[in-house]
Amino acid sequence: MYNSVLSGGEGDFVEKKSRFIGGGYFVKSEEEALNKISQIKEIYKDATHNTYAYIIGEDAKIQRYSDDGEPQGTAGIPMLEVLKKEEMRNVLVTGTRYFGGILLGSGGLLRAYTKCARLGLLAAKKVVRENFNRTKFSYDYTYHGKILNYLTINGYKILQEEFTDIASLTLYVKENAPIIKDLKDMTGAKIKIEVKACEELPTIDGKL
């Protein structure tokens, strides 16, 4: 389980005639991050600077940044600090600048690129990524109504339904979630439970 973003997005603002574009992107590897940076540089190839910072891995083992020609320590590092403060993982933030003719100074640049990182995270939508088991529950029809009611009350979304001589439902279930014990109790243990796969999924306030 770790803090990250849903997908990707951008926001922009103007500071003393310079236009800044802040981007945020979900990346699972350094290769993905570098590919995205190349895409950004191609899209904004006429920009004065294309800066970035990223943290890869749940252990935050890979951390990189670039000032891309801005004074040392005024762009990449403040963006990386935003990621660290938010405890973000597998996230790339970018800061693109179109120079407007007025120098911002070190403090002004630091604030502007910090804002780029925050805008990027906001646009990409902050989430918590958690592991879920894709789980199939099979049981006699006599329990179907009770089980559906339980799922509705507890906010579960049904991924797949099968109706043969028995009823089967497939759901995303967190590790050690009470649903396993609850449905066993509800059916007197007359329920078949099969974990099909473990998947990493984005959640907001603990919900898919």
Features from the language model and the residues they span:
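Active-site beta-strand/loop microenvironment that shapes enzyme catalytic pockets
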Residues: 75-123
